């Protein structure tokens, strides 16, 4: 087992394949607004497909809160190309006199926020009921703050190297789970350093 930081770096340098081909994905949320800057009360446009089943364009908390989801990509260029294609399709098919709100904090919102509707199937009803619970618990305004989520995963070969580096008997999914949990613990501990 590598005891110190320099030994660990040397160990990883001997296995460059374990630090290549990261998986990346983006989930981007944005509000549909009217010309007057108020939240749209219109239903999810049919040109975007079903909010329940479409893999790339769905709704989040509110019917007007769009979410764009990229598949896992191995390169940043591939990731941005896909996200650009989603944006292009959405903008071309926006209903008349609607725009995408560019900021995370919501536009002017009246008291009523139409919850996302996913149809009459059991899973669709469950998703809408879940959002009703969020609305009751936290209020609508907190739920329509939009943002960008960057998803990141290490390649399977990394976890084999990680287990070897730590003399761990864990393999496969067990090694991944232990590694990601350790990463999260250390992020919470040292995350304040990142901005500096």
Enumerate the language-model features and the residues they cover.
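Terminal catalytic/cofactor-binding subdomain
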Residues: 1-135, 142-144, 175, 182-185, ...
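Extended, regular secondary-structure scaffolds
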Residues: 153-196
């Amino acid at each position: 087992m590598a005891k110190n930081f320099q030994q660990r770096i040397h160990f990883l340098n001997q296995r460059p394949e374990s630090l290549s081909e990261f998986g990346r994905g983006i989930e981007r949320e944005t509000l549909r607004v009217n010309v007057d800057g108020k939240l749209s009360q219109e239903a999810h446009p049919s040109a975007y497909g079903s909010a329940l089943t479409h893999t790339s364009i769905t709704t989040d908390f509110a019917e007007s809160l769009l979410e764009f989801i990229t598949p896992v990509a191995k390169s940043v260029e591939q990731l941005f190309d896909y996200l650009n294609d989603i944006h292009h399709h959405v903008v071309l098919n926006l209903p008349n006199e609607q725009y995408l709100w560019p900021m995370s904090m919501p536009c002017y919102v009246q008291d009523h926020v139409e919850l996302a509707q996913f149809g009459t199937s059991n899973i669709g009803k469950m998703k809408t009921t879940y959002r009703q619970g969020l609305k009751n618990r936290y209020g609508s305004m907190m739920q329509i703050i939009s943002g960008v989520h960057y998803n990141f995963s290490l390649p399977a070969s990394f976890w084999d190297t990680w287990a070897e580096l730590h003399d761990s008997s864990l393999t496969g999914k067990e090694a991944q789970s232990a590694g990601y949990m350790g990463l999260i613990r250390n992020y919470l501990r040292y995350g304040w350093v990142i901005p500096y």
